[in-house]
């Protein structure tokens, strides 16, 4: 039986293998430091105890340790009791072993206790005996930090830490010469050395450097090289014009390095140049997330998973205690820096980033985390191929600076392709339907103490939305000031989803039953509704005369009354009074089609059923989901696949309505009860607030790549379709081959980057043949 938390081998992968186990606070020789301070450390509710014990009497007599009660009854069943704190209203924590000890024989005992994770586990001779499921973990009140007090028997190799260590660190290795963690650690180091010895190009003095696919689904942790690492010793990236593209670099210490950083040169292609300052270098910050991290948007509060997630310039902005599984944010006050724990489930967060001095550096800063062999750090380098960029191969170098000295340089090759991506992709079934990128349910994005700061923050948010192909989001178009800022950034909507909803007219007559309402009542209600909403009808008609304006009518409704009767007259009014007006609803299934297909101009739903897409496309209307996944999973591959190729080809959906983007304050602490909002959900987060702006994440990069995949594939389909009647037989046949290739994609099994590369090659061939025919 494996432990669900501390006993499972999988937990070891969730917590760092690279951090060595610290010295214990208590051994047979006594406590390290003042006894009161040691007791206070254990009373925080996080500790681990391991020892070998021989009971010379059953039932046992005396104390194995004064910290907690460890006894054995007359049958040899071990009992562990953790006394509750005097101020606690909980009961003492008690658990028992399933196996039995024998009098006069040596047995290995190990016990873990964690209030943070609400888990406790008991091991006997390396086997899990108990782990709590529903039993509450009290705030403890431990006793004296002594060993074998008046104990009838012997205790040796006693160790106690004020940390709830995972099982591998407190269980003995098969040879008894260390812990199971020691064995894994040695094997990891040996495997790392073997891989690097076989790939000497990746070695640069005190560090090794490899590259990876930035949207790969493998987590890059701090304890080894990724399985799909590229050891070529070069950074290579390509992008079409009007596209952002990332490169991923992983730096591993071959010897202790006190300080490390990357320095990029300018990139040149003939007379054209990309300044180094235009390439944003950020490190991937690993921190603890709740159970479900990386894979799902459902939460398990008792797990803590070390997860690559945030993109930051300053590693010290967030400190992570990898053994105690805690996250700390840095606040720069006038009188000095302070770090605040944002991972305690028993503490909420009641401050606002509008006023708190929490902000990342503007450029990449040196790191101090490569202090031991095998420790690594992942970096993202974000390149931008502008619309007017000269195509060609831009070359430069990436300098590796370790302890102030150049450890080596890597060649950097950035190829800008000779074509421009369309601003938006289009539906696989209907090129007239644009692939929708919409974000709803985000917090306010105009943070700042002054108007200038608030405007700068808003423009930064609008800019990142545009750069990540999210061209429509709540809270933007209905505000004249924000809309003006969007125009400054160059974000001009061709469609928008408006949160305003006209209430059903029947509510204006609360004293009448539905079957008592008359046509005169309806006319009166419509006149009232038109007057009530005239201002915003005029606003949208004036500000966005050419944009399609989708008005939301009800959310998650599936009854006939809500979907048809309540919407019919309101929809007629909206279409009469607003130019290019559209109506839609959040629905839970196919009933939207049956009940309101004649009213609505598309649908937003949870299902990814291809049949639903076929139905709405038969009317020439769009359909897109707002879930599967929600915004929570940190895995960029999941975001890239589900929001891009899989949506576009496998489900034939027309985009996404992302349910969540910018973190509310409590989202920094995923273990607080309110973090996920309604339902058993994790934080619906892609961006994190800081003073005057926000921090991006690798899953946000995955969203951008999802939409870029669709832009590439839509461009290929448009070019191929246009050449089906080409006079040149080679061009006509190549166009057919491209369309056959697109049709044969199922959107679920292919590697996304492989599809991207193949699409680029087919676009280039079509362009070459078209130019040849034009001559």
Predicted regions and their residues:
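Flexible glycan-contacting loops in extracellular carbohydrate-active proteins
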Residues: 129-160
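Aromatic-lined carbohydrate-binding surfaces of glycoside hydrolases
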Residues: 268, 287-289, 303-308, 313-371, ...
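Catalytic-core region of carbohydrate-active enzymes that cleave or remodel glycosidic bonds
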Residues: 597-676
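Extracellular glycan-recognition modules
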Residues: 32-89, 103, 118-119, 155, ...
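Beta-sheet-dominated interaction scaffolds and their linkers
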Residues: 197-254
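Catalytic domains of carbohydrate-active enzymes that cleave complex glycans
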Residues: 525, 529, 533-562, 567, ...
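Short tryptophan-centered beta-strand motifs in secreted/extracellular beta-sheet-rich domains
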Residues: 106-113, 122
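Extended recognition patches within non-cytosolic domains
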Residues: 21-24, 28-29, 121-123, 154-190
């Amino acid at each position: 039986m494996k432990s669900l938390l501390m006993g499972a081998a999988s937990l070891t992968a969730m917590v760092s293998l690279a951090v060595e186990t610290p010295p214990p606070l208590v051994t047979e020789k006594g406590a390290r430091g003042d006894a009161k301070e040691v007791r206070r450390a254990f009373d925080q509710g996080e500790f681990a105890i391991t020892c070998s014990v021989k009971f010379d009497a059953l039932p046992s007599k005396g104390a194995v340790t004064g910290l907690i009660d460890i006894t054995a009854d007359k049958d040899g069943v071990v009992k562990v009791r953790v006394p509750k704190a005097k101020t606690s209203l909980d009961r003492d924590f008690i658990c028992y072993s399933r196996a039995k000890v024998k009098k006069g024989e040596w047995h290995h005992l190990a016990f873990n206790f964690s209030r943070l994770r609400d888990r406790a586990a008991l091991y006997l001779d390396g086997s899990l005996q108990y782990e709590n499921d529903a039993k509450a973990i009290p705030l403890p009140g431990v006793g004296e930090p002594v060993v074998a007090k008046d104990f009838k028997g012997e205790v040796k190799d006693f160790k106690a830490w004020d940390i709830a260590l995972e099982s591998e660190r407190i269980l003995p290795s098969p040879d008894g010469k260390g812990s199971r963690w020691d064995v894994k650690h040695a094997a990891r180091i040996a495997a790392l050395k073997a891989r690097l010895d076989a790939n000497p190009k990746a070695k640069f003095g005190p560090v090794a450097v490899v590259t990876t696919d930035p949207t790969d689904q493998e987590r890059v942790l701090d304890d080894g090289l990724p399985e799909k690492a590229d050891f070529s010793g070069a950074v290579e990236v390509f992008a079409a014009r009007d596209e952002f593209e990332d490169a991923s670099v992983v730096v591993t210490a071959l010897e202790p390095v006190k300080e490390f950083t990357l320095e990029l040169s300018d990139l040149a292609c003939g007379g054209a140049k990309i300044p180094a300052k235009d390439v944003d270098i950020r490190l991937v910050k690993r921190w603890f997330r709740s159970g479900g991290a990386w894979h799902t948007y459902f939460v398990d509060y008792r797990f803590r998973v070390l997860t690559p997630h945030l993109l930051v310039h300053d590693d010290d902005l967030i400190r992570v205690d990898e053994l105690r599984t805690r996250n700390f944010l840095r606040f720069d006050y006038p009188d000095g820096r302070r770090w605040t724990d944002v991972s305690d489930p028993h503490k909420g967060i009641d401050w606002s980033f509008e006023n708190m001095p929490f902000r990342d550096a503007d450029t990449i800063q040196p790191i101090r985390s490569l202090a031991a062999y095998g420790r690594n750090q992942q970096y993202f380098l974000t390149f931008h191929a502008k619309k007017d960029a000269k195509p060609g191969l831009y070359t430069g170098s990436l300098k590796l600076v370790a302890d102030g000295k150049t450890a080596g340089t890597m060649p950097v090759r950035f190829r800008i392709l000779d074509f421009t991506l369309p601003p938006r992709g289009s539906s696989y079934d209907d090129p007239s339907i644009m692939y929708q990128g919409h974000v709803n349910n985000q917090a306010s994005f105009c943070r700042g103490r002054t108007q200038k700061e608030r405007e700068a923050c808003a423009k930064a948010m609008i800019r990142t939305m545009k750069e990540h192909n999210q061209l429509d989001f709540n809270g933007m178009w209905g505000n004249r000031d924000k809309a003006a800022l969007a125009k400054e950034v160059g974000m001009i909507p061709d469609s928008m989803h408006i949160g305003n909803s006209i209430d059903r007219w029947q509510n204006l007559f609360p004293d009448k039953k539905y079957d008592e309402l008359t046509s005169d009542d309806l006319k009166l209600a419509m006149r009232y509704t038109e007057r009530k909403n005239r201002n915003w009808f005029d606003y949208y008609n004036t500000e966005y005369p050419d944009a399609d304006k989708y008005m939301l009518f009800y959310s998650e409704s599936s009854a006939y009354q809500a979907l048809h009767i309540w919407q019919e007259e309101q929809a007629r009014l909206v279409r009469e009074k607003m130019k290019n007006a559209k109506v839609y609803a959040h629905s839970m299934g196919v009933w939207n089609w049956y009940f309101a297909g004649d009213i609505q101009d598309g649908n937003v739903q949870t299902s990814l059923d291809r049949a639903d897409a076929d139905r709405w496309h038969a009317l020439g209307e769009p359909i897109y989901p707002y879930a599967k996944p929600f915004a929570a999973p940190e895995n960029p591959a999941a975001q890239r696949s589900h929001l891009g190729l899989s949506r576009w080809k496998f489900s034939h959906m027309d985009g996404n309505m992302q349910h969540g983007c910018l973190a509310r304050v409590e989202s920094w602490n995923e273990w607080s009860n309110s973090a996920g909002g309604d339902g058993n959900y994790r934080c619906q987060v892609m961006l994190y607030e800081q003073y005057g702006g926000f921090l991006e994440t690798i899953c946000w990069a995955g969203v951008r790549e999802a939409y870029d995949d669709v832009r590439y594939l839509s461009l290929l389909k448009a070019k191929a379709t246009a050449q089906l009647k080409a006079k040149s037989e080679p061009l006509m046949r190549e166009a057919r081959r491209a369309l056959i290739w697109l049709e044969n994609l199922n959107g679920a099994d292919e590697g996304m980057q492989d599809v991207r590369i193949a699409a680029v090659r087919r676009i280039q061939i079509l362009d070459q043949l078209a130019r040849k025919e034009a001559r």
